[in-house]
């Protein structure tokens, strides 16, 4: 049997994975990352990697009789994820910290730690599938489409994918909870994490203001036709597609359609101004063969984790950039979010949406 490190967040998914692999006879080692201030985390519910979660992971490991280690990654998490999150908002973007965490902290460092422990693989509780294809491992969506997490894993490398294991890829959430209950785990009915783990009560502005007090610099709210409508209290308070809380009066509904951080301006317009035909993504990571120069490829893309995939055509630009052209216009494409590229259920790759949107 294999030696397998399980990334244990303290939730039902990773706990069920640890129990399942242990029952199969594998040598299981649990690792939990402490990612942010333990004082803030204590008693905080529905968040990943909180103080209660670390305790829950330890209790599951004790019940299973497996080794369990808690690694303090608070400083690295702040540098790689929280600071990036704050700067992204100041640049007029809508950040995606869970993907940055997977890329910069969880997978890279957990894999290194697992290898140092002599493990054959690292297992997680993500709802995705790894399928052995003709040219190596492929990342596919989870069978439970309501829980599929492939959107958040597009930054893993092909080499990392070979080492990873996703035992829940063929499970539904209901089946996972039943499995945890069968193993007698107290967390079988624990609610799923909802918040960004380092954002108390979902109020991200508190985090930004603490790190960048200058973030609330006021500026103009301007209609896309050029006339000024009012004043905003800081661009961090706005995101593309936002309608509520604009604080301006107009004869029809207005939406945030563009944020100009250089001039500290929030642009608003009618809903029709949100519809996008094409845009550019940068820092593209490929989990399949890279698209060739001058090639146009028909694919499906996801521009938000909560949206279904839509049909598009992609073509290669220079400097690891890809042009994405929708077959039908889509609404509210936000810089800073991810665009993940699919061929059916397979993840081909993905990148970060830039401000080059038309």
UniProtKB/Swiss-Prot annotation:
GO molecular function, one term: tRNA binding
Active site: 101, 197
Binding-site residues for ATP, renumbered to this chain: 7-14, 33, 125
Pfam families in alphabetical order: tRNA_Me_trans, tRNA_Me_trans_C, tRNA_Me_trans_M
Biological process per Gene Ontology, one example term: tRNA wobble position uridine thiolation
CDD domains named among the record's database cross-references: MnmA_TRMU-like
Subcellular location: Cytoplasm
UniProtKB keywords: ATP-binding, Cytoplasm, Disulfide bond, Nucleotide-binding, RNA-binding, Transferase, tRNA processing, tRNA-binding
Keyword hit for Disulfide bond: yes
InterPro entries tied to this protein: MnmA-like, MnmA-like_C, MnmA-like_central, MnmA-like_central_sf, Rossmann-like_a/b/a_fold
Enzyme class: transferase
Disulphide bridges: 101-197
Superkingdom in the source lineage: Bacteria
Catalytic activity: S-sulfanyl-L-cysteinyl-[protein] + uridine(34) in tRNA + AH2 + ATP = 2-thiouridine(34) in tRNA + L-cysteinyl-[protein] + A + AMP + diphosphate + H(+)
GO cellular component: cytoplasm
UniProt main location, coarse: cytoplasm
Location of the region described as Interaction with tRNA in the Swiss-Prot/TrEMBL record: 147-149
Interaction with tRNA (site feature) positions: 126, 337
SUPFAM superfamilies, sorted: Adenine nucleotide alpha hydrolases-like
E.C. code: 2.8.1.13
UniProt xrefs under HAMAP family: tRNA_thiouridyl_MnmA
NCBIfam families found in the cross-reference section: PRK00143.1, trmU
Record family assignment: Belongs to the MnmA/TRMU family.
Function: Catalyzes the 2-thiolation of uridine at the wobble position (U34) of tRNA, leading to the formation of s(2)U34.
Name recorded for this polypeptide: tRNA-specific 2-thiouridylase MnmA
């Amino acid at each position: 049997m294999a030696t397998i490190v399980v990334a244990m967040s303290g939730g039902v998914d990773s706990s069920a994975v640890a129990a399942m692999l242990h029952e199969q006879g594998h040598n299981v080692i649990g690792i939990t990352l402490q990612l942010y201030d333990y004082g803030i985390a204590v008693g905080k519910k529905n968040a990943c990697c909180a103080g209660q979660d670390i305790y829950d992971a330890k209790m599951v490991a004790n019940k299973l009789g497996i080794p369990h280690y808690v690694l303090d990654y608070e400083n690295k998490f702040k540098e790689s994820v929280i600071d990036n999150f704050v700067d992204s908002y100041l640049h007029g973007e809508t950040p995606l910290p869970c993907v940055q965490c997977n890329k910069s902290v969880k997978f890279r460092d957990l894999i290194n730690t697992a290898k140092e422990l002599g493990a054959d693989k690292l297992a997680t509780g993500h709802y995705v599938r790894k399928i052995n294809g003709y040219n190596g491992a492929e990342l596919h969506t989870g069978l439970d489409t309501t829980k599929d997490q492939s959107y958040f894993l597009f930054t893993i490398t092909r080499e990392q994918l070979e080492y990873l294991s996703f035992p829940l890829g063929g499970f539904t959430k209901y089946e996972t909870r039943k499995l945890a209950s069968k193993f007698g785990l107290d967390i079988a009915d624990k609610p799923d994490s909802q918040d960004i783990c380092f954002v108390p009560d979902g109020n991200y502005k508190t985090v930004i203001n603490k790190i960048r007090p200058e973030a609330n610099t006021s500026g103009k709210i301007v209609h896309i036709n050029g006339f000024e409508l009012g004043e905003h209290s800081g661009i961090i308070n706005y995101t593309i597609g936002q309608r509520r809380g604009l604080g301006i009066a107009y004869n029809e509904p207005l939406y945030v359609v563009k944020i100009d951080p250089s001039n500290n301006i929030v642009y608003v317009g009618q809903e029709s101004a949100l519809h996008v035909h094409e845009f550019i993504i940068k820092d593209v990571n490929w989990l399949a063969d890279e698209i060739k120069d001058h090639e146009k490829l028909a694919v499906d893309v996801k521009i938000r984790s909560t949206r279904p995939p839509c049909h598009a055509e992609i073509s290669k630009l220079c400097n690891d950039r890809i042009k994405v052209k929708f077959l039908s216009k889509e609404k509210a494409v936000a810089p800073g979010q991810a665009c993940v590229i699919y061929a059916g259920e397979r993840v081909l790759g993905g990148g970060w949406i830039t401000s080059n949107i038309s």
